[in-house]
């Protein structure tokens, strides 16, 4: 029985070490003036100076959700996931997405597949109000079986509006936005457990929710201290807001049925579930005490399922009611 993400083939700790090895080789890749990097602690997007603002850049893919979507004949929405994984990261630094490019690698040309991917990419860009300005298609049968999909998003933010987590404070309220399902993380483990139930399958391949328009509306109404996109690593993403504080989640959003089923099916420990999956929590927003009522009003008007899930406190780490 597979009980952890590592046993399914994805070792998060090993992945972090491998990424660190790559980053260690990147010294001397900066320039002065426009294009000069703006330092961010564990930022969700890379930032470089441009005039009186900054370009924000993200790149990401969909991962093994592609395989489940293929099995369930749901490839027409997988492009939404690709856009979402990038633009949801961009808005965490306060940047508005401007343009997106995709990369498709194939083992052979497939016009039906490409049309399905294109439909999803177009819908994702419409939801994010983002121009799809280009892309690359590579037929590489020696490297790829079936296909892979990734993309890059670029946004812009005024220098004074960059959200870098430096204003997070003890007592800030944490607002949670509901996810639409597992989004695009944990699918190597999910595929080991899935039993081909069509109802569950529909929940598992639901496209990643795009929070761009809701968060942009919020940024225009409330002073937002930090945002965290809850993706791979689960709750640990909260520490990317500002690791000098403790994040207390004592009023979590309801856990969707799909996650309960996965936990029972795989006999997975709660700590592993919350490290691998979003558990119904797609985005977390930190605002000052006193601003939470207005923030909730704006978010709910924008169509989000949102609630106060906890607070920022003195200390370090993450505390979640389900793990106590």
Describe the residue ranges of each PLM region.
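Glycine-/charge-enriched secondary-structure boundary and capping motifs
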Residues: 2-7, 24, 113-131, 142-147, ...
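Short, flexible active-site-proximal loops enriched in glycine and acidic residues
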Residues: 88-100, 272
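Glycine-rich anion-binding loops of enzyme active sites
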Residues: 49, 53, 62-63, 81-82, ...
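N-terminal glycine-rich phosphate/pyrophosphate-binding loops that anchor nucleotide-derived ligands
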Residues: 1-91, 129, 133, 169, ...
């Amino acid at each position: 029985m597979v009980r952890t993400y590592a046993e399914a083939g994805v070792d998060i700790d090993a992945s972090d070490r491998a990424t660190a090895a790559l980053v260690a080789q990147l010294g001397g890749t900066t320039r002065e003036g426009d294009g000069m990097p703006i330092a961010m602690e564990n930022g969700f997007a890379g930032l470089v100076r441009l005039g009186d603002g900054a370009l924000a850049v993200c790149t990401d893919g969909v991962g093994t959700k592609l395989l489940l979507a293929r099995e369930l004949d749901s490839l027409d929405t997988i492009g939404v996931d690709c856009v979402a994984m990038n633009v949801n990261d961009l808005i965490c630094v306060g940047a508005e997405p401007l343009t997106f490019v995709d990369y498709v690698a194939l083992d052979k040309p497939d016009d039906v597949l490409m049309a399905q991917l294109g439909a999803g990419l177009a819908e994702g860009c419409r939801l994010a109000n983002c121009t799809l300005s280009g892309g690359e298609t590579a037929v590489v049968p020696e490297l790829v079986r079936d296909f892979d999909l990734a993309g890059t998003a670029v946004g812009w933010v005024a220098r004074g509006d960059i959200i870098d987590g430096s204003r997070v404070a003890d007592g800030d309220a944490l607002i949670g936005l509901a996810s639409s399902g597992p989004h695009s993380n944990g699918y190597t483990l999910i595929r080991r457990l899935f039993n081909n139930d069509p109802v569950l399958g529909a929940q598992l391949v639901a496209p990643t929710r795009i929070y761009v328009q809701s968060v942009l509306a919020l940024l225009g109404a409330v002073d937002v201290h930090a945002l965290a996109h809850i993706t791979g690593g689960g709750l640990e993403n909260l520490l990317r807001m500002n690791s000098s504080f403790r994040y207390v989640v004592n009023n979590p959003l309801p856990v969707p049925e799909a996650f309960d089923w996965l936990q029972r099916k795989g006999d997975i420990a709660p700590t592993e579930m919350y490290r691998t999956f979003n558990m119904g929590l797609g985005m977390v927003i930190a605002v000052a005490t006193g601003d939470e009522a207005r923030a909730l009003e704006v978010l709910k008007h924008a169509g989000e399922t949102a609630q106060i899930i906890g607070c920022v406190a003195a200390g370090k780490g993450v505390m979640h009611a389900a793990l106590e």
